[in-house]
Design a protein with these regions (language model features):
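Aromatic- and charge-enriched surface segment that lines or borders ligand/interaction sites
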Residues: 18-21, 43, 140-142, 147, ...
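Ligand/substrate-recognition segments at binding pockets and active sites
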Residues: 19-28, 33-39, 51, 55-57, ...
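Detector for C-terminal structural segments
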Residues: 48, 58, 358, 362-396, ...
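N-terminal lobe/hinge region of extracytoplasmic solute-binding protein
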Residues: 125-175
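A structural "hinge/loop" feature
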Residues: 130-144, 239-245, 540-561
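Surface-exposed binding/hinge segments that line
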Residues: 213-256, 270-275, 280
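A bilobed periplasmic-binding-protein/Venus flytrap-type ligand-binding module shared by bacterial periplasmic
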Residues: 284-287, 332-358, 362, 371
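Ligand-site clamp/hinge motif
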Residues: 288-328
Length: 570
């Protein structure tokens, strides 16, 4: 796009000669640009190569040459700003636009969405943070969990109705409640070309044995080619459904020791990682996928932390507010989860009953929603939660328990994830409310991986967290409960045993339904968790009618492998 000096020279040339209909002299241009004749010719050649001008030099000294402008300085700077936006250099782009944030936002919105590039169908999406933790066992946030579904496969999977169906395994059978057999599709390969082997499956599940959900796996064996047997230490009539969880996706044996695997994972799924920088994540279609090859060739997720999510008007994004719900038609749905406060009743102040009652009664969803109304996140489609999942009403009609105000000057520690648009605002609102009672709140933003470290988290008194099942299947609650031990670390041992007993009872019989209602009620009634908000999710029908089959999944995204772009036919 030319050097800064060349652009300055072009601007000077354009200002002087734009309305000149007669010929120009090379000597006059040289004087204007303060260059020698030789350097002036080089400058004009570069401008011509950039397609800013048409330069037809005359032959012979003193004769007039023809200078024609085919671009303007504004167009040059606009084009350069677009290029910098593509590269994620928003600060440079804003400077080129003379600090005009509206112009910057327009350029960003124009660059995003659906496009055709070199015969390929490309979808570009904005996101407010980097996506570098894509290993299934570490995917603690829901956007990472969505991407894991695009990059990896499990032995089984849940469909949109929440029913279990085959994935890497095409059939399975329960030989006994402690012996399950899975039949594997042949010739499945990872993105790097390596064939999926028994050892990959075995090592994936042996690495998960510290998780309560998979702790009863006694051994994994292969009695014959493309057959996998699981021997369990206790009866489990629902084992096949458990294998559909996001953290049970199959990874290669090399992933367990590869240092950068979380950022550059290799799976078997419909999309593979082709780039994952601080500015951009690019997924490209897996040409050798064992299922249906995706119709979208490439998905780019741009990291745009400087731009508030509510300002981005992209039709492929989750609805960010109620102001245009009419345009979302029947595609609007409620997130299958909620934002919540998790109280540390094990090592935090909430282990004291009076503190527990005080915090759960003075911090209310309505109070926090009112504070959000006055912030930049006003209108993001949140509403009061009466239970952990939409439809549950465990918070209603609960008796108010009397409490004594804690001592003035007492300190409460609140933890939450870094790079979250809501949590700092909610933390500020909680701080202001507790200050009315003389209580000091100290907030602690955590890096995502630090959330998994018990040593770093045990001093936190309460957590701002969020959960989403991502499916209609209630068993998905197991991933939230056990994948990262967050709930266990904050729950008294005797209470957590009650939850595990409910699950043991469920898996002991094929007739038992998953106790999602009982578990959620127990967590709310014990004041372990205070549900805060549910959220609306949807795909706009207005912004881009060429995208087909785009519906919002349970993790707030649309499934990349199922959408396609309808071509325009004249």
């Amino acid at each position: 796009m030319g050097s800064p000096r060349l652009r300055t020279q072009f601007e000077k040339l354009y200002t002087h000669y734009n309305n000149n209909d007669s010929g120009v002299q090379i000597d006059d241009i040289a004087d204007l640009l303060c260059c020698t004749r030789r350097n002036t010719r080089m400058v004009l050649k570069k401008m011509s190569d950039e397609k800013w001008i048409i330069w037809n030099p005359a032959v012979g000294r003193g004769k007039s040459s023809i200078l024609e402008f085919i671009s303007t300085p504004d167009a040059v700077y606009l084009s350069l700003a677009r290029q910098n936006i593509e590269e994620g250099k928003l600060d440079v782009a804003l400077e080129l636009l003379d600090g005009n944030q509206d112009a910057l936002l327009d350029l960003i919105n124009n660059a995003l969405g659906v496009s055709h590039e070199k015969g390929k169908q490309v979808v570009k999406l904005p996101y407010y943070r980097q996506l570098h933790i894509l290993k299934p066992s570490l995917a603690i946030r829901r956007s990472e969990q969505h991407l894991v579904q695009q990059i990896f496969n499990g032995l089984t999977q849940w469909n949109k109705a929440g029913d279990i169906e085959g994935d890497i395994a095409h059939h399975w059978e329960m030989l006994s409640p402690t012996h399950w057999r899975f039949y594997i599709r042949p010739s499945i390969s990872f993105h790097d070309g390596k064939l999926l082997a028994f050892e990959d499956i075995k090592e994936t599940f042996l690495a998960l044995k510290s998780n309560f959900v998979f702790a009863h796996i006694h051994s994994v064996s292969s009695p014959s080619l493309n057959i996998i047997d699981f021997a369990l230490s206790k009866s489990d009539h629902h084992f096949a459904s458990k294998l559909a969880q996001f953290n049970a996706k199959i990874i290669p044996t090399t992933a367990h020791t590869q240092q950068d695997y979380s950022r550059y994972p290799v799976g078997t799924g419909p999309y593979k990682i082709s780039e994952n920088t601080d500015k951009k994540l690019i997924l490209t279609a897996n040409e050798h996928y064992f299922g249906y090859r995706p119709l979208i060739d490439s998905v780019e997720v741009w990291t745009l932390p400087e731009v508030a999510p509510i300002q981005l008007k992209l039709g492929l994004e989750v609805s960010e507010g109620p102001e245009s719900y009419s345009s979302y038609g029947e595609k609007v749905d409620v997130d299958k989860g909620c934002s919540y406060l998790l109280f540390n009743r094990k090592t935090g102040v909430a282990k004291d009953k009076n503190w527990q009652v005080y915090l759960s009664q003075v911090i209310t969803p309505l109070m926090l929603l009112n504070e959000l109304q006055n912030s930049q996140m006003n209108g993001i489609g949140l509403f009061n939660a009466y239970g952990l999942l939409p439809g549950l009403q465990h918070c209603l009609n609960r008796a108010k328990v009397p409490f004594t105000l804690p001592s003035k000057g007492s300190v409460v520690h609140l933890g939450y994830e870094k790079e979250h648009p809501l949590y700092p605002l909610l933390g500020k609102a909680i701080e202001q409310r507790l200050a009315l009672d003389g209580i000091v709140l100290k907030t602690h933003p955590f890096d995502t991986l630090d959330l998994l470290c018990e040593e770093k988290t045990q001093s936190i008194d309460m957590w701002l967290r969020g959960m989403s099942l991502g499916t209609q299947c209630p068993e998905a609650l197991l991933s939230w409960l056990f994948a990262f031990n967050e709930i266990e670390r904050a729950t008294p041992e005797e209470d957590f045993i009650q939850i595990t007993m409910l699950i043991d009872n469920w898996q002991s019989s094929p007739e038992n339904h998953f106790p999602v209602n009982e578990i959620c009620r127990y967590l709310v009634n014990s004041d372990q968790i205070l549900p805060l908000f549910h959220g609306w999710m949807g795909i706009s029908e207005n912004a881009n009618n060429s995208i087909q089959n785009a519906s919002c999944n349970g993790l707030g995204w649309f499934d990349f492998e199922t959408v396609w772009i309808k071509p325009e036919i004249n």
